[in-house]
Amino acid sequence: MREENVIQETRERALLVGVDTGEEQDFDRCMEELGSLAKACEMDVVGLITQKMESVNKAYYIGTGKVAEVKEYAAECEADIIIFDNALSPSQIRNLQDAIDMPILDRTTLILDIFAIRAQTREAKLQVETARLQYLLPRLVGMHEALSRQGGASGSMSNKGTGEKKLELDRRKIEHRISELKKELEVVEQDRHTQRKRRRNSRIPQVALVGYTNAGKSTVLNQMVEQYVGNGDKKVLQKDMLFATLETSVRSIDTGDNKPFFLVDTVGFIHKLPHGLIKAFHSTLEEVQYADLLVQVIDFSDEQYRQQMEVTRQTLEELGAGNIPMIYVYNKADKCNMNQLPKVMEHQIYMSAVDGVGIFELAELIKSKIYADNEDCTFLIPYEKGAVASYMMENATILEQHYEAEGIYLTVNCHKQDREKYKQYLYK
């Protein structure tokens, strides 16, 4: 099947190719998402070719007859590059490039390229470069243009005729660079570990925002910051684009009742997220593993939101975070003809983060989960134990207080550990 798009701009022109083996729940949606990825990589999609097969061709991924059709159609629509909706093996890339005589990309390379464009911090850049080089290493033959996609390198994926010495030199350079990157990442990861340890020692719960890319996680964090922090400098990049956020950002949220929490914004997930990226970003994604609560942000206006939730579930399982308690934020509900927002239930909330509708209720829902073990109790604290009273003032929610001759009566909502620690002052 063919589809052709007419475009005006003169950017890199991409022809998309996919094979429907029946394994995907919604193959058309997968191809649509591939187009979005290409556009996110600043390409123009000029055409689409799909093929139904029981299984992919080991040599060419598509059928041998389809290869000639792809070559012909690529020339017709003046494509500069061909993108396949799956990870291709090194031999498949080599065979396709030999047969079609055009640069060949797969979905994994495309996602890696987007990550490279979006990476801002030193850690993100190191992680992305590591993932790209590790993916490139076994695909060197016939892929020299891929070297141009590594910082500062040049070449052409379609270049041919390079000898074995050149390939071996390239391989050694890449292996050496990967070794250097891993050493640099170890230093950065140690810093992250120190910061995480400091947060854990504070006993303040950690809440991680997770979910599909572009679901609104950064918008939720920014609205929380605006309402409870009030410092615009603490906001993160918020754009309607795939993978706008690659860095893990942590913000301290204090709603004024001595029930603070750390809110963590994380990189978004996507269907067929490359395993190499998950591995390269493990130190960043580890923040999810250490969370006391996960807040899955869902684009409720997307018809495929259930499939996106399943992708999120599978990715969390792969990260070892599948058993962490979770609440569900059905974001962009204002686009779904829901008149009464926010709508709060036991483990979920329907809201519109971009309008700030439901932020207060979400904060309350979060606190009800992470402080579920808190207890209401009354202490009688002697005046000479002022440090105990000060501790309660700073670390518990004060429900009532009054001063009598024998000391300070404090009725508080506090952590059970604090109740046990100061049980000698409990008022019977």
Language-model regions: role of each:
Residues 11, 149-275:
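Conserved G1/Walker A P-loop phosphate-binding module
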Residues 21-25, 57-60, 118-122, 165-166, ...:
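Flexible beta-alpha connector loops of hexameric P-loop NTPases
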Residues 102-118, 123-156, 322-327, 332-383:
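Canonical P-loop GTPase G-domain recognition
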Residues 373-428:
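NTP-binding/hydrolysis catalytic cores, primarily Walker-type P-loop NTPases
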Residues 33-39, 71-74, 88-101, 257-259, ...:
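Conserved C-terminal guanine-recognition region of P-loop GTPase G domains, centered on the G4
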Residues 4-6, 30-32, 55-71, 247-248, ...:
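Switch II of P-loop NTPase G domains
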Residues 1-113, 425-426:
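N-terminal accessory targeting/assembly segments
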Residues 20-24, 53-55, 87-90, 109-112, ...:
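Conserved nucleotide-binding/hydrolysis micro-motifs of P-loop NTPases
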